């Protein structure tokens, strides 16, 4: 149907032009981009569809896998076909510095004081607080791991492990497994000796690692029994527990948390509507619905107080879950991602 419609439009335009008339301009619908999976399914129900009904116009949504290069290519080519995009912290910092995003109208958002400090940026509005943590199947492991040292212990907990295929998170977890305290992780990783120490620890586990590249894969690996435990996004784990009745467990001590943000691409056709959408998605009464579907923390401070206790206990921002968690050091990864990625890839190929 899409092909037929486009062909008809082109034919009509050709007739108009041949008659010496100006061809009509067809406005593109507001397009919102997020991370896919059960998280985007929840967003569709909580944000996308209700906002579409509110404005009386379609809202399209697409999924992506991240990467500042994707946004750079769209913006620098002119007339980007995305409007509001959810980005990770590094993409927010790099894109804002590079002029890839519109400035946020914080008055429209209700004011900066409504949000956690880490959710406020000139170019972005915090969308979720999420964690990468240890996960395992509680039906298969009655006494599961409680630390990254346990994750590395294949004698006590036999079976394969899964980690994200890349240096970020993986190197931090290796150092935690080797006994580095959470408060010293980035100080140690900032030295050549610390990097070597992390890779040496990874050497121990390498024969037992199944690498994952998309957020859905850890769930698949656990469900199939291919791995005994994995690193995973906490919201994906609680999401599948609720939607499919799984008994997957999340281990918050030693987890790494970060804030994802909404941005509006520079010169996007629907930039004003995109700001309106972000304001709608940031309302406390709307954000408070998210933990019913996926257990991500909420940047709007009022929203957090509206979440029932049965759901709030699963959030990364719950006080008990934050106790031994680590904040992702965005500046460290902006400065070191390229070098450490090259080193990681070389290590992987050995």
What are these regions (language model features)?
Residues 265-325:
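Mature extracytoplasmic/periplasmic domains
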